[in-house]
Amino acid sequence: ALKIISLIGTNVRKIILGFMVATSFLSMWISNTATAVMMLPIGIAIVKQMSNLKSTDKKENIIFGKSLMLSIAFSASIGGIATLIGTPPNLVFAGILQEIYNVEISFLKWFIFGLPISILLIIISWLYLTRIAFNFKQKEFKEGEIEIKNELNKLGKISYEEKVVLSVFILTGMAWISRSFLLNIFIPSLDDTIIALICGVSLFLLKTKNKNGFKERIMNWEDAVKLPWGVLLLFGGGLAIAEGFQSSGLANWIADNLTKLNGFSLIIILMVVIAAVNFLTEITSNLATIAMLLPILAPTAIILDVHPFILMVAATLSASCAFMLPVATPPNAVVFGSNYLKISDMVRVGILMNLISIIIILIMVYYILPIVWNFNPFENPFQ
């Protein structure tokens, strides 16, 4: 993360861009909460370094602090959109699709569609934060480069163990991306879950290195119990809710009552779904919201005679774009705890980002998704 920030530059706007690129990249692969917690201390150190400068106006430092904190929160949420493992709603979508239609969404299939959306939202949110929401008078901040170098020096050279974990991480990502068009030729039954398990277990087998040679494992059970297993329980609960909705007939009953939507065009229905999920997740868990809505949207697609992907993907993406309130997402709560932001700041800046994300998701899902995933949005093949 620090390397990415140092490479992008010391201009105030570039520092914020560096934080957003680093945060979003990390969020593609690890929990957005962990990413925000990791990036926050670095951001606070940069803001404090700027406040110590005699040339820095107090108001300018406050503006920079707010913008940097929001950039961390926004990019942590946006980065998760890019990959299937980036955020729990994406996994719930894949799981429910497998449960209801026995259709697999591979890592690569989601990545091809999710990454461009993530990049587009990062660019737009950076321009919005640095040129519209906040206006910086102080353009240069060379001391920021010094602080970043200090943080890098504290870390020291990359260790053997870090190299091992990085290698496993790269191999995992490459295996996920190449599975559908390369690895399945040699191992037809290989799927993304097996790849994840193999690479995860390998960390328990590979050993660390010290002056006396190899001794401990890279990971042990004490490390494993500290992992956020609650997310997996929530994920399992979401699939159980989906099955309950289907088997009880509740999903079909709700879908039947949505027949009034039949008179509207698909793009209007999409806009309603995206906006509803977007603002609903401001006050509720995005995982719970998606687990509740996706089993309803599947039969609703049959009633409306549209492809279920179009409604389900739209809802899934919009669940990751709640930028207004501290309770909306864990990254929002993390940066709010830094005391650089007020709720009014988050609402003022976040509401326009919500609206921007609604428009971007609407355009991408309606026009691009059917092309990338090769389906007819006005035809339901699962009837």
Regions found by a protein language model. Give the residues of each.
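Alpha-helical transmembrane segments of multi-pass membrane proteins
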Residues: 12-25, 52-79, 105-113, 266-279, ...
